[in-house]
C-alpha cells in the first residue's frame, strides 16, 4: 500500500510518517510535547531553542581536546557528517523523544566526576574513574558509519580505544558469555526519565565475541574533543555493524554475565528490536524496509536513498561470528 507522505516527512527526505517509524508510546509522547510547544512559541521560546541548537554549529572551543591519531584501518570513503548534525540530531530518550531534545536539554548531565563499575564474572572487578579510563589505553580516531534502525545514517569520527583492552584487564571468567552495558538513570540530570517509554535504566548487551571484536570501541570523544553530553558523555560504546540503539550511552556499569541479558528495546518490543540487531538490508523491520537509508545532512527529498550495506559495510570484520546462524531468526 502506498503511504502518503506528510509535508514534514517529505522535506526531511523520509518515505514514511514518523508515526510509522517510532514506537507508539514515543510518538504519543512527542505529540503531547509538540502541542504544548505551540503555546510556548507565542512567548518566544522557540527562538531560544533555535539559539541553543545553533551553538553546536562547530566543535566547542571550550571543550576538552583529545590528542588521538587517526587509525588508517578504520576510515570510510564517504563524506563525514557535520559536527552540527552529529550533535543536534540524536536519539537519547533520557532527555526527550524529539531529535533536538538531547542538544537542548542535556546540559543538566554532569559528566565529571564519573565512575564506571566493571563487575560480574571477572577476576578483577574494578570501579574506573573517567580520568583513569582516558589513560587505560592509547586513544585513536576511527571514522565509522552509524546506521539507525529508523532508516537514517551518519559518518562519524569517534575517539576511543577497543573495548577489548578493558576486557583483558578485568580478566573475564569462563562463565562470562555476555557483556551488559547500563546507562545512568538519574531524574535530576535526565528530564526524559519522567516519560514511561522504557524500563529505566537503559541497558544493552553483546555476546562476548562481539565485545572482543576489534571494531567495538569504548568511546570518549568525537571530532577531536570529549563527547558532548547529548552524544553519550562521558563514555559510551560504539558497535558500528549494529543498529545505533545497541551502542549504549553514558555508561555507569559494564557487567559480565553467563546468559543473554535483558536489553531495553528488545524487552519493549521483541518482535521489532532483536537482541543482535545487526544491520541487515535483507531483514525488514515489521513496519518499514531496511534496504535503504537516508544520510543525514546529505540526502534530501529529491535525492534517491542509498542502499544499506550488509553489516553496515563491516562484513569482513564480523560476518564470521554469525556463520551458520539464521539471521532472520536471530535478527
Swiss-Prot record:
Binding site for Mo-molybdopterin: 90, 93-94, 148, 183, 231, 236, 247-249
Chief place where the protein resides: periplasm
Co-factor note (free text): Binds 1 Mo-molybdopterin (Mo-MPT) cofactor per subunit.
GO molecular function per UniProt: metal ion binding; molybdopterin cofactor binding; oxidoreductase activity, acting on a sulfur group of donors, quinone or similar compound as acceptor
UniProt-annotated location(s): Periplasm
Entry keyword Transport: no
CDD domains for this protein: YedY_like_Moco
Keyword Oxidoreductase attached: yes
Entry comment on modification after translation: Predicted to be exported by the Tat system. The position of the signal peptide cleavage has not been experimentally proven.
SUPFAM superfamilies: Oxidoreductase molybdopterin-binding domain
EC code(s) of this entry: 1.8.5.-
Pfam families: Oxidored_molyb
Function: Part of the MsrPQ system that repairs oxidized periplasmic proteins containing methionine sulfoxide residues (Met-O), using respiratory chain electrons. Thus protects these proteins from oxidative-stress damage caused by reactive species of oxygen and chlorine generated by the host defense mechanisms. MsrPQ is essential for the maintenance of envelope integrity under bleach stress, rescuing a wide series of structurally unrelated periplasmic proteins from methionine oxidation.
Quaternary organization: Heterodimer of a catalytic subunit (MsrP) and a heme-binding subunit (MsrQ).
Family affiliation: Belongs to the MsrP family.
Protein name per its UniProtKB record: Protein-methionine-sulfoxide reductase catalytic subunit MsrP
Name of the coding gene: msrP
Amino acid at each position: 500500500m502506498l503511504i502518503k507522505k506528510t509535508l514534514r516527512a517529505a522535506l526531511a527526505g523520509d518515505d514514511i510518517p514518523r508515526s510509522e517509524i517510532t514506537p507508539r508510546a514515543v510518538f504519543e509522547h512527542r505529540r503531547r510535547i509538540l502541542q504544548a510547544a505551540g503555546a510556548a512559541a507565542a512567548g518566544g521560546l522557540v527562538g531560544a531553542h533555535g539559539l541553543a541548537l545553533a551553538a553546536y554549529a562547530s566543535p566547542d572551543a571550550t571543550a576538552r581536546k583529545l590528542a588521538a591519531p587517526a587509525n588508517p584501518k578504520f576510515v570510510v570513503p564517504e563524506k563525514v557528517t557535520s559536527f552540527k548534525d552529529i550533535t543536534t540530531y540524536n536519539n537519547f530518550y533520557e532527555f526527550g523523544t524529539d531529535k533536538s531534545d538531547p542538544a537542548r536539554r542535556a546540559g543538566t548531565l554532569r559528566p565529571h566526576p564519573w565512575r564506571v563499575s566493571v563487575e560480574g564474572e571477572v577476576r578483577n572487578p574494578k570501579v574506573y574513574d573517567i580520568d583513569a579510563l582516558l589513560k587505560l589505553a592509547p586513544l585513536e580516531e576511527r571514522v565509522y558509519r552509524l546506521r539507525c534502525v529508523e532508516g537514517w545514517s551518519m559518518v562519524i569520527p569517534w575517539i576511543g580505544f577497543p573495548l577489548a583492552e578493558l576486557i583483558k584487564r578485568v580478566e573475564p571468567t569462563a562463565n562470562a558469555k555476555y557483556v551488559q552495558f547500563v546507562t545512568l538513570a538519574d531524574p535530576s540530570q535526565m528530564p526524559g526519565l519522567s516519560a514511561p517509554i522504557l524500563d529505566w535504566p537503559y541497558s544493552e548487551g553483546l555476546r562476548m565475541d562481539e565485545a572482543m571484536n576489534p571494531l567495538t570501541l569504548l568511546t570518549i570523544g568525537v571530532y577531536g574533543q570529549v563527547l558532548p553530553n547529548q552524544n553519550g558523555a562521558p563514555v559510551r560504546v560504539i558497535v558500528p555493524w549494529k543498529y545505533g540503539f545497541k551502542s549504549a550511552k553514558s555508561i555507569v556499569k559494564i557487567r559480565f554475565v553467563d546468559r543473554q541479558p535483558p536489553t531495553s528495546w528488545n524487552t519493549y518490543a521483541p518482535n521489532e528490536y532483536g537482541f543482535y540487531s545487526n544491520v541487515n538490508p535483507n531483514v525488514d523491520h515489521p513496519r518499514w524496509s531496511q534496504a535503504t537509508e537516508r544520510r543525514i545532512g546529505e540526502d534530501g527529498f529529491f535525492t534517491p536513498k542509498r542502499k544499506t550495506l550488509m553489516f553496515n559495510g563491516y562484513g569482513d570484520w564480523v560476518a564470521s561470528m554469525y556463520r551458520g546462524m539464521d539471521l532472520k531468526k536471530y535478527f
